[in-house]
């Protein structure tokens, strides 16, 4: 799944909701990879000398393709949900994730898109994945708000389950 993202224009706001805390990143400010509470850092992997920050839904967004530029982070405690804003410039050449989460045992769940723009829920264990259609298609060059709600075992797209 090429580092959980591919052909993504940007992620404006990534939220990790734990039982008692919420971590948010806006990409604005002096250190755009530092969470709003100043305690968590996104790890940025890129072959570019300077990461490309672009205009997002609100504020800045990181332009990434999931292959040459992507991000990850480690969280403490249980995570109940992930959310983020994404916009595709093109569809990936293979199924790729907008965002996902993996536990210490190697079990993962991710919201993905295929090469035709169909959204999928990807579930895997140690690199072996299976996908279930979310029965919706993503338009290119339009912002999409994605919420992966682990507590309620659901995915919300632009506020709709």
List PLM regions with ranges.
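Positively charged n-region of N-terminal signal peptides that target proteins for export
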Residues: 1-5
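Bacterial N-terminal signal peptides
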Residues: 7-15
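Sec/Tat signal peptide C-region and signal peptidase I cleavage site
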Residues: 17-21
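Extracellular glycan-recognition modules
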Residues: 24-43, 64-121
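Extracellular glycan-recognition surfaces and repeat-rich motifs
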Residues: 37-59
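Short, aromatic/His-centered strand-loop micro-motif at the edge of beta-sheets
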Residues: 123-144
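Short tryptophan-centered beta-strand motifs in secreted/extracellular beta-sheet-rich domains
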Residues: 142-151, 155
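Short, solvent-exposed beta-strand-to-loop segments that form ligand-recognition rims
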Residues: 158-161
